[in-house]
Amino acid sequence: MLIVNPFATATSPAGRDALAHTLSAHFHLDVELTTHRGHAFELAARAAAEDFDTVIVHGGDGSVNEAANGLLDPPSRSDPDRGRPALAVIPGGSANVFARTLGIDPDPLLATQQIITLLDAGESRRIGLGHTDDRWFLFNTGMGMDAVVVHAMEDKRHAGKTATPARYLWTTITSFLKQSGSSATFDVEIPGRDRIIGARFGFVSNTSPWTYLGPREIRTNPDTGFHTGLGVFVATSTGVLRNLPLATKLLSQADPKARHLFRDDDVDEVCFHAEAPIDVQMDGDYIGAFRDIRFRHRRDALTVIAPPISIPETTT
């Protein structure tokens, strides 16, 4: 099944027709266009129920997240031994973080050929996913600053403005300056660790990189990957002077360290607790404001059509 979001930023009717024609020349293909939010979830769930071999999503990260959640049962009752269709991605959004992290070509037509080659060769791999009690995430979730940015960007898209790297950067800067005077904080709990008090923003990553500034990779948790647990990146300050050196390290891909920063690249569980609801985003979609939210990791949760990766050897 090919699920296409016709409203995604980088899709066009001609491009969609070309990649659908190319795929249908190689495989029996059911093409479905999404018409509303949540439709990719519904279509992927149908594909799982009807025993499709593979679901290919041509759209942005939001559509891919919906499809992944449709392919899998909710985390609270997921059966890891139950067969599910594999997930493949042809980039169609503005960021395409998940596809880029998997090693999929950013050009949709080249990505289509890449997916065909991988399917013909039987290439697939299992990846771990992060989740709350009722929802899976593919690459990142967060409370505080990044969720504020995502919320602001969604408002701008609804107002008819295109999501571009420059607009994301400007929205991030202005949101950061606005939030620097905010008193909203939350605490962070990781089993076996001291409680982190007064966090201002926190990222929970399922892989790295999970964010980009145009073509530049930003790695908040360099050692986190689909083969590890979750990465946690929590800052207890939004002060500009304290965060400028940290931002410089992130932009230069140096090891991100700071006195006001807690970082761990491999945990199985993390909980955020706030006195008042704070914005939360998941895979680049704003999901609401929460006081308490828990994130866990599930290894080998999803089969993806993607190039193989070399996992660094560990020494003991």
Q: Which role fits each region the language model picked out?
A:
Residues 1-58, 65, 311-316:
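ATP/NTP phosphate-donor binding region
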Residues 3, 13, 72-88, 92-201:
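Catalytic core of DAGKc-family lipid kinases
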Residues 40, 61, 122, 202:
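Short conserved active-site loop signatures built around small residues
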Residues 42, 69-73:
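Reductase modules of NAD(P)H-dependent flavoproteins
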Residues 142, 146, 203-219, 286:
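Glycine-rich phosphate/pyrophosphate-binding beta-alpha loops
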Residues 146-149, 196-198, 209-214, 240-244:
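Short acidic/glycine-rich loop or secondary-structure boundary segments that cap or lie
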Residues 155-167, 209-239:
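Gly/Ser/Thr-rich active-site loops/lids in small-molecule metabolic enzymes
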Residues 190-191, 219-227, 234-316:
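ATP/nucleoside-binding phosphotransfer catalytic cores, i.e., glycine-rich phosphate-binding loops
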